Amino acid sequence: MAAAVLVIAGLVWWLLRPSPTVAFLGDSISVVTSPEIKTALGSDYSPDIAAVLGIQAGQMIPAGQRAAAKDPDQVVIELGSNDVLHGASLDNAQADLLKLIALFPNARCIHMVNINTHMTDNGNALGPRAGTINVALSHLHAADHRIDIVDWNQIVSADIAAHPPGGTLTDDTVHPNPAGRTLLARAIKTALDDCG
């Protein structure tokens, strides 16, 4: 009898437990993908999304501080594209991403969405600049077991290889279209689920 009560109590706790909070810090890619992210996460997670059009990594530090004050279980950072697009110092962008990560010492996992190296600006290729940020993200991943990479660049690259010349996941080489948003949201959900 006591064992049955414990099983029932455990089941009730499991059903009524709050969803783990996930802090999202992002730019316009996160703005346009927010509905798909919320759909993909369902009731498994409680997303706290702070995303601003055109924002660079360093400009999100105040929002990161506010998110950190809520002590989220996991963090998703999708920033750096505007640093690449607007010609910002990549050294500063990397330092700003480190500052954002440092705000979350208690997060179980920090998921960094890397940058699409196929972005262009008025026809000018931005791959080398985006690649520099992606290499820095890989180094962060190697240095901190909590950090992983949501490989948006690989998703876009594979799609472009299958559907040349520009692929089917973005309309402007930067922002994901509905198909791209769905794939990005699923990749984020997979990363959250794999946090161990």
Please describe what each predicted stretch is.
Residues 1-3, 21:
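N-terminal export and membrane-targeting signals
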Residues 8-22:
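C-terminal region of N-terminal signal peptides and the immediate post-cleavage residues
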Residues 18-99, 119-122, 128-131:
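Conserved SGNH/GDSL esterase-like catalytic core that processes O-acyl groups on lipids
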Residues 23-25, 111, 148-150:
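Hydrophobic/aromatic beta-strand patches that form the interior of the parallel beta-sheet core
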Residues 50-52, 113, 150-155:
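Conserved beta-strand termini and adjacent loop/short-helix elements that scaffold enzyme active sites
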Residues 78, 113-114:
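Alpha/beta-hydrolase-fold catalytic nucleophile elbow
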Residues 106-110:
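A short helix->loop->beta-strand "cap" motif at the edges of active sites that frequently abuts
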Residues 118-196:
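Catalytic His-Asp segment of secreted/periplasmic serine-dependent ester chemistry enzymes
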